[in-house]
A protein has these predicted regions:
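Conserved NTP phosphate-binding and transfer environment spanning the P-loop NTPase/kinase superfamily
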Residues: 2-125
Length: 125
């Protein structure tokens, strides 16, 4: 889910809408993740044509993951639910600044809506 994400030289949570706001622990965790992303840079450089599926709104990820877990429960009888699902979604929403996903160096960008319908396609040649 973070293919191509690079550490940000400088990031601020002030321009993100996250509710509830980031805790001190979450801010500290974000810094750890930013440092850990440095270890992926060599891997990202080996991939020469990333295709980036990007939601129009970041929060669509919550909707998609919740639906995925509901389907898994219906099909397999087991899935993340209630507090476990909420905690997982919170981790996804706060671990990497949203602006990081705007800076992925991709060959192709596919912008999709909440229903995963294609809105726009672009090439970064």
């Amino acid at each position: 889910w973070f293919l191509g994400v690079k550490p940000l030289a400088k990031f601020s949570s002030n321009n993100e809408i996250i509710s509830p706001t980031l805790s001190t622990y979450e801010i500290s965790y974000r810094n750890i993740i930013q440092n850990n992303l440095k270890h992926y840079l060599d891997i990202w450089n080996l991939i020469d044509q990333t295709w980036h599926l990007k939601p129009l709104k970041y929060e669509y990820m919550n909707f998609w993951k919740s639906n995925q877990e509901q389907e898994m429960f219906l099909q397999k009888g087991n899935a993340l639910q209630n507090e476990k699902l909420s905690n997982f979604l919170r981790m996804l929403n706060v671990s990497i600044p949203h602006q990081s996903f705007d800076k992925i160096n991709s060959y192709a960008l596919f912008l999709i809506d909440k229903k995963r319908k294609l809105l726009e396609v672009g090439l970064n040649i």
